[in-house]
Design a protein with these regions (language model features):
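Short glycine/serine/threonine-enriched helix-capping/active-site loop
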Residues: 29-34, 127-128, 135
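Conserved donor NDP-sugar-binding/catalytic core segment of glycosyltransferases
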Residues: 6-51
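Residues immediately flanking
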Residues: 4, 54, 91
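C-terminal, non-catalytic tails of nucleotide-sugar-dependent glycosyltransferases
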Residues: 27, 37-38, 48-79, 83, ...
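A short, conserved alpha-helix in the catalytic core of glycosyltransferases
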Residues: 14-17, 77-98, 103-131
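Non-transmembrane alpha-helical segments in soluble domains
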Residues: 18, 44, 114-115, 163
Length: 193
């Protein structure tokens, strides 16, 4: 899946994603998507974090030259979910997971598919070497729908549906996010003790 507003920032982005998706244990692989101003839009999703406790976009609005948490932007790593803005899934695994829920809008559909793949025993991977730009024609109004964690603020019905569907998974916490880190955002900073 590739959002129509994505812009290729490197020639090898598809080969990067394909190289990871060929591994049998990988459900979905996503790339890093940045805004034209050089800040991160999508770089994996952490479960149970953010204002709505559903999922938060990792490193949202931080500079895209950020090294990540312990340098994890320098290597591929598992994440609970990836955005469908830039996502590659084997058709076989997509079909086995039941595909995307047509009742869900963008981002929520990718989040849901990622969790279905994880439930089936697959891992989802962020490949920081697959980089895309995002240039929506109405960027200001488009992104006004997201808060500081990259969560969509005007999609209460979508959020509630996914929180109900995945409540048990979310309650357990994200297996790739240290419990000592803040639950306010997925910037991987220490929480309050």
């Amino acid at each position: 899946f590739l959002d129509s507003d994505c812009i290729c920032m490197q020639e090898s982005w598809l080969e990067e994603l394909l190289g990871v998706a060929q591994r049998g244990e990988v459900g979905a692989v996503g790339g890093v998507v940045s805004y034209p101003k050089g800040v991160i839009r999508d770089a994996g999703i952490t479960l149970g974090v953010g204002y709505y406790n559903l999922g938060s976009c990792n490193f949202y609005l931080l500079n895209d030259d950020h090294s990540g948490f312990w340098g994890n932007f320098y290597y591929m790593h598992n994440v609970s979910a990836v955005s469908d803005t830039c996502m590659l899934v084997r058709k076989e695994y997509y079909d086995q997971a039941g595909g995307m829920d047509d009742g869900l809008k963008a981002w929520f559909a990718g989040f849901d598919l990622s969790l279905k793949l994880m439930k089936s025993g697959k891992v989802n991977v962020l490949d920081p070497y697959a980089r895309m730009g995002f240039a929506h024609h109405d960027m200001i109004n488009w992104e006004a729908r997201r808060n500081a964690n990259g969560e969509y603020v005007d999609e209460t019905e979508q959020r509630n549906l996914l929180k109900e569907r995945w409540s048990e998974v979310i309650r357990k916490g994200d297996p790739y996010y240290n419990a000592n880190l803040t639950k306010n955002s997925s910037d991987f900073i220490l929480g309050k003790f």
